[in-house]
Amino acid sequence: MITVGYSTRESKPEFIEYLKKSSGFKKLEVIEKVNNGTKSLARVYNEILLEAKTDIVLFCHDDIYFDTPAWYSKLLKHFEKTDFGIIGMAGTTSMPASGMWWEDRKKMVGIVNHEKDG
């Protein structure tokens, strides 16, 4: 099984419902952590790891949408390969001084889609 965890400034029950529906897995464990900047994201993610009832934890933001329908089973298949311990969808090969990993698009890796006003 997979746990999905995210940090948010305010509770978003509609996002929890979206995650469950889009995953295609009704029993998806979702851990929402309301955090108004009092804790670092790393600390919140560590709390999620401690609370998770599964060995696989997906961290995400509270404003994402999955382009892949029924993504749960597809993601789970990747973890059946024992040579994976961590899987990422997007990032950079080098972190600029600004901390904005998307600043140099030539160093971006993965898939990032943004809505026009998002």
Whereabouts are the PLM-identified features?
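Glycine-rich, basic loop-to-helix element that forms the pyrophosphate-binding segment
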Residues: N36-A52
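N-proximal low-complexity "stem/linker" segments adjacent to membrane-targeting elements
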Residues: M1-G24, I31
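Active-site acidic Asp-centered loop
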Residues: C60-D62
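A short beta-strand-loop structural module common to alpha/beta enzyme folds
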Residues: K27-K39
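Short aromatic/hydrophobic "clamp" motif used to bind/position activated sugar donors
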Residues: V57
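Conserved donor NDP-sugar-binding/catalytic core segment of glycosyltransferases
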Residues: Y65, P69-M108
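Short, flexible, basic/aromatic active-site loop/helix in glycosyltransferases
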Residues: R105-G118
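Alpha-helical elements of Rossmann-like donor-binding domains used by nucleotide-donor carbohydrate transfer enzymes
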Residues: E14-K21, R43, E47, A70-K77
